[in-house]
Amino acid sequence: PHIAERVFVYQWKSAARFERRSGLATGANYNDYNTDYFGVDYGVGWLNNVNMAVKIGTERAANPEYPYENNLLQMSRIWRAYVISELADNFGPVPPANAFDGIVEYKSIEDIYDFIISELKDAAGKIDVNADMSAITSEKTDAFYDGDASKWIKYANSLRLRYAMRLSAVDQAKAKAAFEDAASTNNFITTQDEIAQVQEKGGWTDLDGVMSRPWNGQAMSVTFKNLVVGLGGQEF
């Protein structure tokens, strides 16, 4: 919750006028949280961890011990693509995957998105929906989908659609081709239960929601205002 809450609330939530406080909306400096987010304990640490998972999974792929190992590898690649996008969107060019050792080369955002979209397509195509995933549960391994490999494919294809749209700002032709390629699968998130999400919990853990703090004041949205104005014949 530390940086996830504060980076969101002090920066983006403030700028979007979802909360009455300073931050980006007033030019206030909360760079300490940004520094934490991009540090080895958080953003870069997350990427290092998933890179290690992909590395181990790739090494074991030639001689897997369990039927779900290939799918775990592909799920890790999909998650890594998302983590890379978060870092790149927030901080700009970052080193490519598996390059956080020694002197690294920072890639452009366009190159990063090319890698992400290609990685998502390849990983989704290698998931085996018939593999026994019964040992993979939300409590231990898969907080999103409880081991449902088919939903990871939908997640990957949906991310491809999202990232293709982001590419449109710099290369419309490439973005159009990437979007249409993902859309042609006709296999992406369409229902609420397919969304990659975790149940928010109380307390101070990694699964706590950033919008659920008792001290976190919420500004009323226009949508809610429109719903309640005139409700029951009473003016708002």
Where do the language-model regions lie?
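Short acidic-aromatic linear motifs embedded in glycine-rich loops, typified by GG[WY][YF]DAGD(H)
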Residues: P1-D114, D132, F188-F236
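Acidic interhelical loop/turn segments
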Residues: N63-P67, G125-W152
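TPR/TPR-like alpha-solenoid repeats
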Residues: V83, N90, A123, Y163-A164, ...
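Short, well-structured active-site flanking segments
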Residues: A88-N98, G125, D171-D181
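Bacterial peptidoglycan biogenesis and beta-lactam-recognition machinery
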Residues: M165-Q199
